């Protein structure tokens, strides 16, 4: 498949963690927010967060450790080059909030349905349970001038 179908901006509709027994949880809550961008030049960027995050007590960037931890636990972001191979899109992470992903590849199975894109990650351990993260994105269209 051509990478052309990916190009553009996408808005996160849902992000679920699914177990092999069918249990579903919501790592960023049931109403997450996020954007996913794919460029024609072969770059991508994704940001996902829990909706209605709590503001820091002050407007300064230096915050207490508890506030920083809460901010980290409710937000994720990375970017880099991408390529399409068969039914997988591979994100080659160059920068990431989670430092362990920098320099690594994040592989996602993909499926298009109309203006929706579903990305499914390989199983990961969350809370000691193997789960697949499934994100559903909706293509954003340019606002009318």
Predicted features and spans:
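Lipid interaction determinants
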Residues: 1-77, 84-145
């Amino acid at each position: 498949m051509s990478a052309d179908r990916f190009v553009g901006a996408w808005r996160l509709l849902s992000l679920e963690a699914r177990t092999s027994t069918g249990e579903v949880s919501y790592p960023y809550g049931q109403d997450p927010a996020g954007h996913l961008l794919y460029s024609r030049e072969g770059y991508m960027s994704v940001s996902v967060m829990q909706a209605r995050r709590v503001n820091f007590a002050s407007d300064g960037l230096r915050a207490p450790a508890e506030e920083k931890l809460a901010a980290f636990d409710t937000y994720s972001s990375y970017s880099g080059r991408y390529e399409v191979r068969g039914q997988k899109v591979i994100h080659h992470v160059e920068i990431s909030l989670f430092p362990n992903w920098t320099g690594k590849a994040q592989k996602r199975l993909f499926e298009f349905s109309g203006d929706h894109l579903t990305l499914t990650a390989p199983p990961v351990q969350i809370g000691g349970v193997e789960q697949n993260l499934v994100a559903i994105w909706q293509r954003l269209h340019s606002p009318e001038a």
